[in-house]
UniProtKB/Swiss-Prot annotation:
Lineage summary: Eukaryota, Metazoa, Chordata, Craniata, Vertebrata
Name of the protein this chain belongs to: Snake venom serine protease KN14
Glycosylated sites: N105, N172, N213, N255
GO terms classed as biological process: proteolysis
Protein source organism: Trimeresurus stejnegeri
Gene Ontology MF terms: serine-type endopeptidase activity; toxin activity
PROSITE patterns: TRYPSIN_DOM, TRYPSIN_HIS, TRYPSIN_SER
PANTHER family: KALLIKREIN-1, KALLIKREIN-RELATED
Family classification: Belongs to the peptidase S1 family. Snake venom subfamily.
Amino acid sequence: MVLIRVLANLLILQLSYAQKSSELVIGGDECNINEHRFLVALYDVSSGDFRGSGTLINPEWVLTAAHCETEEMKLQFGLHSKRVPNKDKQTRVSKEKFFCESNENYTKWNKDIMLIKLNRPVKNSAHIEPLSLPSSPPSVGSVCRIMGWGTLSDTEMILPDVPHCANINLLNYSDCQAAYPELPAKSRTLCAGILEGGKDTCSGDSGGPLICNGTFQGIASWGGTLCGYVREPGSYTKVFDHLDWIQSIIAGNTNVTCPL
């Protein structure tokens, strides 16, 4: 009887995992074409490879994750379908890139942030509009929107033609500490996801925004080995903690340092 019960429990766990994986911009749907005017697609100029996403914060600047960096970057604005671009799509290249100290000085829990100055400003249009920086930090329990052209599967790289969106929850930092024991006691990151699994950012979604209660609060940074897995939420660079750094660089003070 005990053996039968153990086998039954194992079967339930397997079915539960299979369900979460299949639901796995894992677990989302195609974004509304009008809800991501600020979303930027990043490419490596030399290889043409897709590198992730960024957020347009004013006509000349894009905020993304440091680990999305390549030597020369192409940025596409007003993009929804990659195969059938919007008529108002605009393309720019990186003129300057700014990091916390260097493009290699970041970790899973600190300083995974990059500010890109464009070679020339973009113009607002039907599908292009900057997203404002936050005026206050987010609250645990907030409903947050994730989006990107990242893989739809955690077992193989399946990049969609259009960005996918999903709603997740802003969690306590302790939830990420429980999942990832290597995390320090404090971090300038946000912990977000669905603890029951099923919705998550994944490979290719890096650098994209975490929008909590309508406000830009985080930058997709990293997560568990499997996307959308139970009790393995994602980590997002906390935008609010880097406001002084961002605003100082945009104002021309490039000697400013990131918060410790």
